[in-house]
Amino acid sequence: MRESIEMPKGTFYTIVAICAAIIMMTSMEMLIKAKDTDLFNMWLSTSNLGEDALSQTTKELFSTHLNVCISTFFIRIITPMAVAIHSYFTFTKLRVTKLFVAIWVVIIIGAFALTFLGEQFYSIFFIGSAIGYLALIFAMIYLGKCIRNVRSI
């Protein structure tokens, strides 16, 4: 009985394509958030900026808004980037184990929850990103089933 398998080529390309789609959706959403003045004004009215924000100009507040958008962007794309890079090394040099699948499923669920908790649900890019995360979870579960099928042979 083998505890690890080589990553199937189709599964690797599926995982990388889903990660690319998630990154693209997140990029488009952050681009729209950073450049829309209505969203900036909504951010000003809903955010709890504190006392020092009263003395800042609109230009300084917009700079703060852009920094928040960029920080959020990097936090959201780190997980799909890491999944794609680790899958590449697993596909070319390493083997897939149950531990690989379990750890990435937990991390992807956490990234999905982080995205789900902090977004507007009416955004088409949020919906696309959520579908991408669910597809990535199902791809990892399929990879786990491939390991079980090879082990039972």
Where are the language model's segments positioned?
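Cytosolic juxtamembrane helix and N-cap/initiation of the first transmembrane helix
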Residues: 1-38
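Cytosolic juxtamembrane helix at the C-terminal end of the final transmembrane segment
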Residues: 6, 34-37, 85-99, 135-153
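Aromatic-anchored segments of alpha-helical transmembrane domains
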Residues: 22-27, 105-116
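A loop-to-helix transmembrane entry motif
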Residues: 39-44, 57-82
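Short, highly charged, low-complexity non-transmembrane loops/tails of multi-pass membrane proteins
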Residues: 43-50, 151-153
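Membrane-helix interface and helix-disruption motif detector
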Residues: 64-71, 95, 117-128
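Loop-to-transmembrane helix junctions at the membrane interface
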Residues: 69-108
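Alpha-helical transmembrane segments of multi-pass integral membrane proteins
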Residues: 110-153
